[in-house]
């Protein structure tokens, strides 16, 4: 069923926080790190900005369906594939989603296991993978509002921890930002390749952008003819959430 106005309880700021939470994860720095030393640190940042800007534009264009009509990905895809045929792109979309869920659950559980072993001497990675996965499933099942509330706590915390780790690592290796950005790349890959790599991290989410945007508050009705007025909130949230993170 389409999302009705009273169910649209997510502000543009809350949506921005949600995307910061989505983007602030280990996959982001891991992806960027794989591009060095083929590209310089500055080139990697430029590739990250360009790649995520393209993804943000795609998210906004496809998310327009959710903003205007309040329908999710599983519904709007039927217009192209039919009622039964819609299962095919649904399955294709589910494969990378399952992979990323498993991979990131393992990474999170591995970090928790390392902390637990350091503090208590006890280690049980399998148990933590199960518990961590269950917590994520419960949080998701509680709906977008529960996810948003969790991100209000998680996003700033992760950003602060990331900054602390950055400063700590730089001090340990006696590095400054000027020294980091003075390093060049060996040209092993092109900028175009790097942009595509950075796009690949979140490009699959562009398909189901309406799953998020259908909960956005709108000051205008779904029949508003001005595309920018309807979608500017989601565009800025996507852009600054992805690029800033």
UniProtKB/Swiss-Prot annotation:
InterPro entries: Pur-cyt_permease (IPR001248), Uracil/uridine/allantoin_perm (IPR045225). Its main location: membrane. The chain crosses the membrane at residues 13-33, 42-62, 71-91, 95-115, 127-147, 150-170, 187-207. GO terms for molecular function: nucleobase transmembrane transporter activity. Keywords: Cell inner membrane, Cell membrane, Membrane, Plasmid, Transmembrane, Transmembrane helix, Transport. It holds the Pfam family Transp_cyt_pur. The keyword Cell membrane applies. One of its GO terms (cellular component) is plasma membrane. It is found in: Cell inner membrane. Belongs to the purine-cytosine permease (2.A.39) family. This is Uncharacterized protein in hyuC 3'region. It comes from Pseudomonas sp. (strain NS671).
């Amino acid at each position: 069923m389409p999302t009705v106005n009273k169910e649209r309880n997510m502000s543009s700021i809350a949506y921005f926080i949600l995307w910061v939470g989505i983007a602030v994860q280990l996959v982001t720095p891991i992806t960027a790190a794989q591009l060095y030393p083929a590209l310089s640190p500055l080139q990697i940042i430029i590739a990250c900005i360009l790649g995520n800007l393209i993804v943000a534009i795609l998210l906004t264009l496809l998310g327009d369906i959710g903003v205007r009509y309040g329908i999710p990905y599983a519904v709007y895809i039927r217009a192209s594939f039919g009622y039964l045929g819609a299962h095919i792109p649904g399955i294709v979309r589910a494969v990378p989603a399952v992979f990323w869920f498993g991979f990131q659950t393992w990474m999170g559980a591995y970090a928790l296991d390392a902390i637990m072993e350091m503090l208590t001497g006890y280690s049980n990675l399998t148990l933590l993978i199960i518990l961590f996965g269950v917590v994520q499933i419960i949080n998701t099942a509680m709906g977008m509002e529960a996810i948003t509330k969790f991100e209000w706590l998680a996003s700033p915390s992760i950003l602060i921890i990331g900054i602390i780790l950055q400063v700590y690592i730089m001090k340990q290796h006696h590095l400054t930002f000027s020294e980091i950005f003075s390093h060049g790349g060996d040209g092993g890959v092109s900028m175009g390749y790097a942009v595509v790599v950075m796009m690949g991290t979140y490009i699959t989410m562009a398909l189901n952008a309406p799953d998020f945007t259908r909960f956005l508050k709108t000051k205008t009705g779904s029949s508003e003819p001005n595309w920018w007025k309807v979608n500017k909130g989601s565009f800025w949230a996507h852009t600054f959430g992805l690029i800033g993170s």
